[in-house]
Amino acid sequence: MRDRLPDLTACRTNDDGDTAVVIVEKDHFMDGFFHQVEEIRSSIARIAQHVEDVKKNHSIILSAPNPEGKIKEELEDLDKEIKKTANRIRGKLKSIEQSCDQDENGNRTSVDLRIRRTQHSVLSRKFVDVMTEYNEAQILFRERSKGRIQRQLEITGRTTTDDELEEMLESGKPSIFISDIISDSQITRQALNEIESRHKDIMKLETSIRELHEMFMDMAMFVETQGEMVNNIERNVVNSVDYVEHAKEETKKAIKYQSKARRKKWIIAAVAVAVIAVLALIIGLSVGK
């Protein structure tokens, strides 16, 4: 539990009640912000786990000629959950962005605003990274599914080019494309079912990829525009570290030079005392004579 004593003390000792309230409310505002940051982090981590589960289901589906319907249902549920969570995250990130814009010339301190801007940029980058991984997994699954269709067609004696296969996929009607080989005794019902099943999988993927495109581009463009700000922060941190290290070295040199100068002063003083003593001795002897 966070220590609230400083806040309570500020409220008690401050004669201006309004000022005390502002301090507490401001603290509460940042507490709420950091709570929201943790929620977004958890949601991004949950999407990352879902993406790993999606990849596993993709592998299972690709390894079986006719995978169980349960696996495909689970895959659809994962896709829906990822999109729902992603839309929620995007909404929260946009809300933070709008809040920062409103407070740009408001009453919030520059420190608080920089913290919120930085956290927003970091979370946006993480979000885009995990959604990029999800998008790449879908594209890979599409290509591998397309390869399975092509191999099944080759088994029937029907050689297809990539352009022809893409034309079939875009038409959405595989039955027209393979109608001339259905009567061929060389094709098995299992092979035909797999071709149609893979085609349906690809059609669902096309829809999913289109739905994600707008969201992905929106966040990717934001991260690109905010990237320079994050880079500037990183450069400032590095420069600060370099400056501190340089200052340490200069301090060491100054101490070293100061020590040498102090040592020289003591030597000069000792020599001066010795000279004075010798002169005094000579003068004393001269007077004695």
UniProtKB/Swiss-Prot annotation:
List, in alphabetical order, the GO biological process terms annotated in this UniProt record.
acrosome reaction; cell differentiation; embryo implantation; intracellular protein transport; vesicle-mediated transport
Give a GO cellular-component term.
cell-cell junction
Which GO MF term does the entry hold, naming one?
Answer: SNAP receptor activity
User: What are the alphabetically sorted keywords of the record?
Assistant: Coiled coil, Membrane, Transmembrane, Transmembrane helix
Q: Does the keyword Oxidoreductase apply?
A: no
Q: Which residues lie on this side of the membrane: Cytoplasmic?
A: 1-265
Q: In which domain of life is the source organism classified?
A: Eukaryota
Q: Where is the protein found, in the record's own terms?
A: Membrane
Q: Where is the t-SNARE coiled-coil homology domain?
A: 192-254
The UniProt entry, under Gene3D superfamilies, shows: 1.20.5.110, 1.20.58.70
Q: Could you tell me which InterPro entries the record lists for this protein? A: SNARE, STX2_SNARE, Syntaxin, Syntaxin/epimorphin_CS, Syntaxin_N, T_SNARE_dom
SMART domains, sorted: SynN, t_SNARE
Q: Indicate the segments annotated as coiled coil, or none if absent.
A: 68-101
* Record membrane topology: Single-pass type IV membrane protein
Transmembrane feature ranges: 266-289
SUPFAM superfamilies, per this entry? t-snare proteins
UniProt lists the family membership as follows: Belongs to the syntaxin family.
Q: What does this protein do?
A: Essential for epithelial morphogenesis. May mediate Ca(2+)-regulation of exocytosis acrosomal reaction in sperm.
- What do we know about how this protein assembles, alone or with others? Interacts with SYT6 and SYT8; the interaction is Ca(2+)-dependent.
- Protein name per UniProt: Syntaxin-2
Q: Which organism is it from?
A: Mus musculus
Gene symbol of the encoding locus: Stx2
